[in-house]
């Protein structure tokens, strides 16, 4: 099962291609510890994007990593996040080859970060970037809705 959630408009074909690329990247990296080159002329996949990849197995989180700044073309950001979520999330051991068929993949393409007042936050639409000193963490929009949080719980 796979899903691409975007803040920008991507066609169904582009979303499918990103999910395919994400899974292929995980498979190849698991076997060969490398990221395959990817060639595309699709302008939507070449534009810089901030991306998070979430991996689950049987609904249990198995990895979630990405970046909030659009430093790479979308396709490469997906590849980087796929490898990081699958093999570098410090909360979990790396994905094993026998786990790959069970992976549920979500790709979140983030919109540019903007300040927002707390009373303007819409659960399921807005994520939160929380910073304290040099540390920061991101709550994707689905975190609050998946956990049935109200606004106060989300902000606590």
Give the label of every model feature segment:
Residues 1-156:
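Basic nucleic-acid-binding interfaces
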